[in-house]
């Protein structure tokens, strides 16, 4: 809860703050309307370098290259695209011990209107479990600052990729 005179940050502002707190200035994303609120804030901020990728595995490759060059990176994608990134994660990011936080718009939950999103949305967490990929699900912005900071600490201390799944309950979802 915000104190007198403090403005409560929304979920997108909280993510931007956390990325800055963890010196994560290279942001690679596959465009998606549900994450537009956060990527537009990033795009407006000169601290960040925002790179649009055509596919999710390309985004992972760019982020790993950025980290190898000395610049912390994060990736934003949709859950259906997470399926596209599995090989890049399993054969590059995980064995190279690259700390890449991935912010994933998790589709297929309450309020989903597109049946094609449901199967992959349900498969994301079990796939992450099989890869040994730590993951957290954000359904509201309560204690979001602590969860994001803890996730970033885990990601960097263990030098491993990590997923932060953003649900439709958090960001409002897509409109049919």
List each model region and its residues.
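Thiamine diphosphate
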Residues: 2-176
